[in-house]
Amino acid sequence: MNDIENYGNRYHVLQSFPMPQLASSREIRILLPASYYESDVSYPVLYMHDGQNLFDNSVSFGPHVWDIPEAVDAFFPNSQYDGVIIVGIDNASSHGKFSRMDEYSPWPRNTSFPLPGWDPDVDYSGGKGALYVDFIVNTLKNYIDSNFRTFPDRNNTAIAGSSMGAYISLFAAILRQDVFSKVGVFSPAL
């Protein structure tokens, strides 16, 4: 795996990016195509969840990262017309044990159904998924499209994730078919 520092001005981190829909903030991690600063072309955008797991082991909340920079560079050779802008949205795990579940769950948890191994006294309610999707569509996407050279149309906008990130990706793709034309659903928590 390459160190993320090797990607220089291609890798951007937006600290404490506001999430008004959820009265919160989050780090947003952006990887630009290798040719971004060598051309004036626009690029499609892929929004991904669990952003801290995409690029850099030092900030990952799990034991492994997706190695997105290596995968993207292998898939898109250094042609000025190839590439995609990857936007990683950090999850809410730093805001509480189950905050990630709250944001990635479109529907509230049925508290009368006990889940094995879960503490019923923990304030995990879920049901914030629609607000999270609204943040992506109406706040984050507007920022990305305004500050980077993107193709903002639905044919060039995708969303992807794994586990609960896959779950919310599928929900977003169904809910906002006017925005997302492609969805990556990896090992979904369905």
Where are these regions (language model features)?
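Non-catalytic cap/lid and distal C-terminal segments of serine-dependent acyl enzymes
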Residues: 1-190
